[in-house]
Amino acid sequence: MHPYLISIGSFHLPTYGTMLAIAVLAGIYTAIRLGRRVGVDSALILDYSSWVILVALIGAKVLLIITLWSYYRAHPEEIFSYATLKLGGVFYGGFLAALFFTIWYVRVRKISFWKMTDVLVPSVALGTAITRLGCFSAGCDYGKPTTAPWGVIFSNALAHEATGVPLGVRLHPTQLYESATTLAIFAVLLWWSPRKKHDGDVFLGYLGLYAAGRFLLEYLRGDENRGFVFHHLLSTSQFIALLVLAGISGVFIWRRVHGSEKASALSEGSSTEFSQVAGANAGQRKNSRGNHKAKRKMQNSKPV
């Protein structure tokens, strides 16, 4: 495709880097707009974003190095090389690093984790949709060979050199598949956000939708160097997606159990209060009837 958006002499503007910058700006803008609706301060989101972006980039690189450890163990000098710096990294590495940072950040700032993440995850979905367009332009995260009419053929030698994408072969445009998937998730989250019943619903919904979509899309990926587990049975991202789905199921079960216990406690409390009120009313009616009878007896009695 077009790994460089602009090339003037020795100056080259990478398409991936440009799309990443656009994704960051679009994500921050979206988070600020959504935050205002629920009372999250814009300055807080800007401060958080300036840190979490750096943390996510480092996390993505770290998981990339872990998944390709057999190569980096043999070539440790490449860990801090420019070639590694140019690589995009692994999404889940950046996401998990950002998640742990968020847990720490909200504790320090004393704000609700669920409320904060509900504001942020639509921006993550939108940012992923934009960034994957940069991946498509650079040739990374390419798909398996296909005979489908919408398959794409890469012909840029620079893309092949940087990402290893096969040239002259019709491939699944998995980058566009994921871009469309995350854009659809973004639309669902925007619709869901004002209709959620509990804080955290949007965050958990994003985790489930993305994990399911990513798990299926991994079967169409053709870049074999992205890392696998269990003797090539699952890719690293598929394994993490399964852990995420299991974690979400646990949270929903916990919420359901504790929600039922809370509802039961409220019901018992209401029943007790109702019984007390009913007993008090019955006592008042009994006293009233006793006073009325005493008054009638006094009126009917004759003086001696």
Mark where each language-model region is:
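A feature for loop-to-transmembrane-helix boundaries and adjacent hydrophobic helices
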Residues: 1-291
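Arg/Gly-rich low-complexity intrinsically disordered repeat tracts
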Residues: 293-304
